[in-house]
A protein has these predicted regions:
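A metal-dependent hydrolase signature that marks the N-terminal structural subdomain at the beginning
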Residues: 1-116
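Active-site scaffold of zinc-dependent metalloenzymes
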Residues: 113-163
């Protein structure tokens, strides 16, 4: 069954299939990611505030180290929130067929899966009043991709992670 103009579950499954697995994601190398980004994100926020004068009224940034599937899930939630008003309006005038919802899901799933293999992090500021605040205003770090880039270019992990933050 479809959930309107986009079959969100199909998009999620396709994206995860395209994303694949990064071998380093299950290694001991990932153990320090959570600790490092918990320390470096507030540190980077202070450096930016000192340099620009920009200070968040909402408090300190919240960091979350996730895998590719987590990044896909977060972005599907964001797309659903962002597109909800447009899709609701469209549904009343142009009801979606099963075929169009599958095509939309395939397009979205392929793009998100491809992007999940390349993105290192993301600041998600999509705020809506009717959603859980713990799901919004986050800095995501895609752990497997960060580990892969560190290895590929022989970056010093601490320096690279602070730079990302």
């Amino acid at each position: 069954m479809t959930d309107g103009p986009v079959d969100w579950e199909l998009a999620r499954r396709l994206a995860r299939k395209v994303a694949g697995d990064e071998p380093l994601s299950c290694s001991y190398l990932g153990d320090s990611l959570h600790e490092d980004f918990a320390r470096f994100t507030p540190m980077a926020e202070e450096l930016v505030a000192a340099e620009t004068g920009l200070v968040s009224d909402e408090g300190s940034a919240r960091a979350r180290v996730i895998d590719r599937a987590g990044w896909i899930d977060a972005n599907i939630r964001a797309f659903r929130r962002l597109l909800r008003p447009v899709l609701a309006e469209s549904a009343s005038t142009h009801p979606a067929s099963v075929v169009t919802s599958k095509i939309a899901a395939a397009e979205l799933g392929m793009v998100l899966g491809w992007m999940s293999r390349r993105v290192l992090g993301q600041y998600d500021l999509l705020l809506t009043e009717d959603e859980d605040r713990d799901d919004q205003d986050l800095v995501y770090y895609v752990g497997p991709n960060i580990l892969s880039i560190e290895k590929k270019f022989a970056f010093d992990p601490k320096q690279f992670r602070l730079w990302l933050a």
